[in-house]
């Protein structure tokens, strides 16, 4: 009798079986990345070094290629590309048509951690494809070239168990002439799509980004993906926090400030649990728009906004869409959310406002915000 379990499904079952054994990420992901027994530790001073180290980890001592990787891997990145970042910042509208730069982690399931050394910086993306158990921490990534070639800062495709933690991602929330919607600037900060699931995005500082990120590639990419966004700071961003198509998104203890178009856009029957966040100076921070149907639903709890009367206090405004849409302009829950399968201890929304900047982003020694710091 033929097996009814596909390779992808088998990978997800493996992820479930390891759920209680790996590191606690505060979200759906449970992984130690490459930081496990038998790991090989390397230092990379450039993008190409990272590429070479990963490729070398795909073959054994005899030079034979090993499916999924020959050994778990921890890479410390020490490079500094501030000169490229500064040049791009001085020529924002010239970046779109350049060649995209990035490290592709493809078909690697043995476990991989990339951690940026303090003071390092990158003008390249990290693209995770058909891989699992990937951790990226303390990377400062900005002003990437190659928007026309899908030059995302992070792209996660068909990859379960990925954790992006304590990174800084930045560009310019700016429109350049050249297309119908003036979209010739930069690509996304974090796109999660095409079968990617059990992903945790935590303690990142994301600023000056027009298109922050996707959860789902298209209206047909509505897999039952599970993603947690917690303790992130979003500042001066346009939209897609995320743009969610189907699946489940748990967003807690995030700081959203300076949203210029729309925030969490829950589409294609997606479900979102939005709790203990701080919203301010934001346009349509929770919405379901662009499709005209199949509206997503949300549960709102513990946020600094509790009722419509709070909108003026925190400078929250709402805009319509050309198609039928739903805004959270009554600030009420519109659905239910599945039981969260992991333990977490959110701090108050006020503590997020007061303290999160001391913890999110790079150079913070990967510290986390506990309730004891809120006093």
Swiss-Prot record:
Cofactor(s) in the UniProt record: Ca(2+)
GO molecular function annotations of the record: metal ion binding; pectate lyase activity
Catalysed reactions, semicolon-separated: Eliminative cleavage of (1->4)-alpha-D-galacturonan to give oligosaccharides with 4-deoxy-alpha-D-galact-4-enuronosyl groups at their non-reducing ends
Cofactor mode of binding and number, as noted: Binds 1 Ca(2+) ion per subunit.
Active site positions: 240
InterPro entries for this protein: Pec_lyase, Pectin_lyas_fold, Pectin_lyase_fold/virulence, PEL
Residues reported in the UniProt entry to bind Ca(2+): 150, 152, 187, 191
Record SUPFAM superfamilies: Pectin lyase-like (SSF51126)
Cross-referenced Pfam families: Pectate_lyase_4 (PF00544)
Alphabetized SMART domains for the sequence: Amb_all
Gene Ontology, cellular component aspect: extracellular region
Endpoints of the signal sequence: 1-22
EC number, UniProt record: 4.2.2.2
Disulfide cross-links: 93-176, 351-374
Enzymatic class: lyase
Subcellular location: Secreted
One of the GO BP terms on file: pectin catabolic process
Metabolic or biological pathway: Glycan metabolism; pectin degradation; 2-dehydro-3-deoxy-D-gluconate from pectin: step 2/5
Keywords recorded for this protein, A-Z: Calcium, Disulfide bond, Lyase, Metal-binding, Secreted, Signal
Family: Belongs to the polysaccharide lyase 1 family. PLADES subfamily.
Function: Involved in maceration and soft-rotting of plant tissue.
PANTHER family for this protein: PECTATE LYASE 18-RELATED, PECTATE LYASE 21-RELATED
Protein name: Pectate lyase B
């Amino acid at each position: 009798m033929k097996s009814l379990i596909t390779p992808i499904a088998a990978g997800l079952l493996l992820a479930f079986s390891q759920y209680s054994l790996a590191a606690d990420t505060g979200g759906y992901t449970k992984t130690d990345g490459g930081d496990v027994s038998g790991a090989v530790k390397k230092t990379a001073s450039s993008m190409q070094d990272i590429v070479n180290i990963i490729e070398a980890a795909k073959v054994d001592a005899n030079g034979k290629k090993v499916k999924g990787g020959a050994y778990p891997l921890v890479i410390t990145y020490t490079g500094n590309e501030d000169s490229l970042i500064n040049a791009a910042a001085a020529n924002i509208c010239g970046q779109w048509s350049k060649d995209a730069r990035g490290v592709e982690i493809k078909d690697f399931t043995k476990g991989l951690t990339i951690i940026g050394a303090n003071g390092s910086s990158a003008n390249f993306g990290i693209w995770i494809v058909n891989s699992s158990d990937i951790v990226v921490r303390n990377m400062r990534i900005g002003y990437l070239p190659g928007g026309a070639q899908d030059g995302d800062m992070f792209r996660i495709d068909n990859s379960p168990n990925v954790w992006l933690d304590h990174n800084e991602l930045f560009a310019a929330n700016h429109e350049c002439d050249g297309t119908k919607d003036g979209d010739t600037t930069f690509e996304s900060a974090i796109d999660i799509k095409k079968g990617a699931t059990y992903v945790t995005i935590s303690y990142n500082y994301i600023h000056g980004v027009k298109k922050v990120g996707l959860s789902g590639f298209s209206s047909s990419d509505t897999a039952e993906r599970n993603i947690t966004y917690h303790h992130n700071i979003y500042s001066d961003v346009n939209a897609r926090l995320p743009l969610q198509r189907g699946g489940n998104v748990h967003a807690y203890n995030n700081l959203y400030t300076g949203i210029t178009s729309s925030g969490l856009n829950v589409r294609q029957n997606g479900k979102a649990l939005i709790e203990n966040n701080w919203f301010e100076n934001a346009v349509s921070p929770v919405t379901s728009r662009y499709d005209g149907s199949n509206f997503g639903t949300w549960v709102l709890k513990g946020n600094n906004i509790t009722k419509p009367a709070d909108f003026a206090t925190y400078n929250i405004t709402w805009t319509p869409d050309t198609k039928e849409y739903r805004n959270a302009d009554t600030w009420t829950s519109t659905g239910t959310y599945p039981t969260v399968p992991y333990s977490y201890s959110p701090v108050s929304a006020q503590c997020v406002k007061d303290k999160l900047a001391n913890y999110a982003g790079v150079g913070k020694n990967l510290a986390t915000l506990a309730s004891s710091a809120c006093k």
